[in-house]
């Protein structure tokens, strides 16, 4: 038996994920290799089709040896002689978040590895699979939902073929300058890579602000796992930090942290939201930042953004918290945590002091 051969591949536009199709003597498989060549690498797989006759039973022994097995006959929808696929007719459509993909053949969806692949024994969907199997679930059962996501993703990525950043940048700067006046500094934080991102500094009434622009261009992964049908309301974010002028010496270290954090959701295949925390080590006496959303907390100021691609942009203010507060916050829900805040309308403005009183 010859070694399997990679016959087609592509890379996610925003995540460190390699998508490829592998052909063996027995079958074709679609793979997503997440963070390849790293300690955190994960491989997601989905059967595409068999080559030659289909077996009566699943080859468990081959699976145990790491060999991609053929699908048993009772779960196969393609012809008995199997598939013979031309690599030049493949196309990969990345989902909007960049962490999931559909494989097309002659413009028809034949295999899909969505963001929820890997949970509860689910690998992905395949056009030629029937029912629920260990190798793939039947695509026909989910076709309406999946095909809609694929069409939306095609339209989404086509938006970036034009001079999109000039328009998006102008929208962000207009929102920020309406909030704090003429901006003072503009930092590119994308490292020259897609998507473009910036951090904009401004000030008003004795407070210095640093707010990102462009993080919201790409929706964050896996927001639907928490927000369900409302996930599109919360999957686009910008990050903000506000500090009194007396403490503005912190800005360089905080802005550097924000620059790295701006890529965090796509690097780690996760999302940031109201009530989440991230550890820090650059503000003495404080061990983490708590994210709060003005959309979820009445009275807290925010720039007023226009919708982007028909979706809301959510600013997340970063609120530094002490070690004891961090331990409490991670064990309780956000509403209970915020009940200890002593000045909710200025909770986002850091002055070197804790914003909470009386946390047990």
Describe each model-derived feature in a short phrase:
Residues 1-360:
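Short linear motifs embedded in intrinsically disordered, proline/glycine-rich low-complexity segments
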């Amino acid at each position: 038996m010859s070694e399997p051969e990679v016959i087609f591949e592509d890379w996610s536009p925003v995540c460190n994920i390699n998508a490829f199709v592998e052909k063996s003597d027995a079958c074709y498989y679609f793979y997503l290799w997440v963070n390849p060549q790293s300690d955190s690498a994960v491989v997601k797989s989905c059967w595409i089709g068999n080559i030659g006759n289909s077996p009566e039973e699943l080859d468990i022994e081959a699976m145990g040896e790491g060999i991609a097995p053929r699908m048993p006959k009772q779960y196969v929808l393609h012809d008995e002689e199997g598939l013979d696929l031309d690599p030049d007719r493949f196309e990969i459509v990345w989902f909007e978040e960049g962490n999931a993909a559909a494989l097309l053949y002659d413009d028809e969806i034949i295999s899909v590895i969505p963001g929820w692949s890997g949970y509860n024994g689910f690998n992905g969907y395949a056009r030629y699979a029937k029912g629920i199997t260990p190798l793939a679930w039947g695509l026909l059962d989910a076709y309406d939902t999946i095909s809609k996501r694929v069409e939306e993703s095609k339209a989404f990525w086509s938006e970036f073929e034009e001079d999109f950043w000039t328009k998006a940048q102008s929208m962000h700067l207009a929102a920020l300058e309406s909030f704090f006046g003429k901006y003072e500094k503009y930092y590119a934080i994308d490292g020259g890579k897609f998507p473009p991102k910036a951090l904009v500094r401004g000030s008003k009434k004795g407070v210095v602000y640093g707010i990102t622009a462009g993080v919201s261009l790409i929706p964050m992964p896996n927001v639907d796992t928490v927000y369900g049908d409302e996930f599109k309301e919360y999957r686009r974010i910008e990050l903000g930090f506000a500090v009194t002028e007396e403490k503005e010496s912190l800005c360089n270290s905080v802005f550097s942290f924000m620059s790295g954090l701006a890529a965090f959701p796509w690097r780690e295949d996760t999302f940031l939201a109201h009530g989440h925390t991230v550890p820090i080590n650059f503000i003495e006496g404080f061990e983490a930042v708590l994210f709060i959303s003005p959309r979820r907390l009445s009275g807290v100021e925010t720039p007023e953004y226009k919708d982007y691609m028909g979706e809301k942009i959510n600013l997340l203010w970063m609120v530094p918290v002490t070690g004891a507060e961090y331990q409490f916050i991670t064990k309780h829900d956000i509403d209970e945590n915020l009940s200890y805040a002593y000045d909710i309308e200025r909770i986002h403005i850091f002055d070197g002091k804790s914003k909470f009183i009386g946390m047990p």
